Amino acid sequence: MKNNWIDVLDESLVKDFYNNQTSEEQQEGLNTTLSFGTAGIRGKFGLGEGRLNKFTVSKVALGFAHYLTSSIAHPVVVIHYDTRHLSPEFAQIIANILASHDIKVYLADTYRTTPDLSFAVRYLQADAGVMITASHNPKDYNGIKVYGEDGAQLSTDASAQLSTYIDKLGHPLHINVPSLTTEQQSLIHSVPSEVREDYFKNVQDLVGTIPQSDLKVVFTSLHGTSVPIVPDILSSLNFNQFELVASQCEPDSDFSSVASANPEDHKAFDQSIELANLIDADLLIGTDPDADRLGIVERDAEGNIYYYNGNQIGALLLNYRIKQTEGLPNRIMFQSIVSGGLAKSLAQYHNVNFKEVLTGFKYIAAEIRHLSPEQNFIFGYEESYGFLARPFVRDKDAIQIVPLMIKYAAELKNEGRMLKDELEDITRNVGNFNDKLFSHTFEGTQGKAKIENIMTQFRSETPTEMCGLKVIAIEDFETGKKTDLQNDEVSDITLPKANVIKIYFNEGFIALRPSGTEPKIKLYVSLSCDHFDVIAQKINDAIFNS
């Protein structure tokens, strides 16, 4: 097939990316196949079935059209896209193919956030949504995420059904994409302005009034979609004591000012810190390119800088939501199985119901969907900096969290306190959990095999002791079994199966899982113990250097 792909290089939309790849990278694209998984599809630009290009995107769109029309008489779909290379082009391709199958499409007229998409699906009562994004991946990546009528990413079963429709189509170069009739072209509409207006109202209702204070905020969109929506929302809440990092708040598909447009990466805040030092700011906030995740940094009066990980931000936000919802009965919060122990302990301390779900915010969305009328959702989060305070969106939503965090910090500022002080109070009450994420990248087909080998070996050689910590239980989410080593009992795990292993100690847990969206395997360590950094590093070395 290689010659066929070379023949279409000029019309593939990815010529420059392909020409800049090594011969090994080019071959990988031609010899592999991108699959539509539980998190959609994500990959590098290039030629071949293993890359994103005009033809592979068209195949996904055509399979999606067949999937929708197989069960829905007159489907309606909302399509949004981020600031990445080819995001608008891919969105238009998908819109055209859906319209050619008589599917009504609402297509954003400019870049939009992922939470915007989730909200729009719900507001417009659409049957599905599509978000063109690769989150914080490098500049030569993009992706397609598909959402159901509830505004959440497709369930595992629905993703599998869609994947079947896509796979049935065969080779991307052999697919006939029909031209649009004039009538079909009229099926593509702009997203109405009232959608965003109603989203604003929901955020305003969540946040209420931000108190007058001396709080100064620095904000960066890391070249993504959260500007102008964040400044607009803050202004609508009468909060104007913020400065944008100008060099990072313009759309830039190359993410030129950062090595990684990821708010988990401390270096992503370097320019924010420079600006904060200039204007004597207190709170620094950054969102990832599609604005579903955010990170925060705090600066004290002496200019000292404090970074917060996802579990600490999650605990702070949960603490604030507990205060906000005081007196509300049957409160419940959700977090992923690899998120740390601090928020869980805080929920238990305040008698808030708590449940863990698989990694992936769609599992939190599914729990929200199935809540009884008597239950009151107050918070959901993943340690990877994804948070949700109120479920008018059914995915991670950095946009609703930004003003909420600012309000929290403003109230504390008026008390002469910082988020740092609040976190110290929380740990004093419920225990100090230290968290660390080790992320190992293994590219290509060899890397994929290495990740599989690491998981296989870890399963077959599960220890009874690690670095002086006694193993008390093991959960293997792939087999769906939990082994209690203290009582010598095996029980069923009630969550869906997933390629995750979690090992418990009296001091906390570790978890090992391959990423669903990147060529990485991740080790999560959450322990309440002395010499945490040393022990965490030893555990990492034992798994990856053995």
Curated annotation (Swiss-Prot):
Enzyme class: isomerase
Catalytic reaction list: alpha-D-glucose 1-phosphate = alpha-D-glucose 6-phosphate
Binding, Mg(2+): 135, 288, 290, 292
Pfam family, one: PGM_PMM_III
GO MF terms held by the record: magnesium ion binding; phosphoglucomutase activity; phosphopentomutase activity
Gene3D superfamilies assigned: Alpha-D-Glucose-1,6-Bisphosphate, subunit A, domain 3, Alpha-D-phosphohexomutase, C-terminal domain
CDD domains documented for this protein: PGM2
Free-text remark on how the cofactor is bound: Binds 1 Mg(2+) ion per subunit.
Cofactor: Mg(2+)
The enzyme's E.C. designation: 5.4.2.2
Active site: 135 (phosphoserine intermediate)
Function: Catalyzes the interconversion between glucose-6-phosphate and alpha-glucose-1-phosphate. This is the first step in the biosynthesis of diglucosyl-diacylglycerol (Glc2-DAG), i.e. a glycolipid found in the membrane, which is also used as a membrane anchor for lipoteichoic acid (LTA).
Protein name per the record: Phosphoglucomutase
